[in-house]
Amino acid sequence: MVAQYITTTGSYGNINNGNGDPEMIYLSPIEQTINKVTINSTPFANIVDTLHYVNITMPKSAAASLKVDGVTPTNSVVHPGDANFVYFQVNLRSGAHTIIADSGFNAIAY
């Protein structure tokens, strides 16, 4: 099991202008993917509405089938560890969001 840590703003080199809390995310292996998920970004007043994101990793061959709220993301980056995979970082507003693809993907919302 592999985990990714995000430090508190201002700590351990995290200098992103005052946004962010500590977080730990368990990374799912590529053998454990999903084809559809609905996530929710909180509308709480103390959360900056433009700072909601979802990171999506999937096979490059299936990237054209990916839709976030019915729209195909266009900002793919070839995964540095394996050129057969791509990575998307999609900015979200608060509310519910549906991610769907013909092939499996892994998604992390924050």
Language-model-detected regions and their locations in the chain:
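Conserved functional hotspot residues at active sites or interaction interfaces
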Residues: 1-110
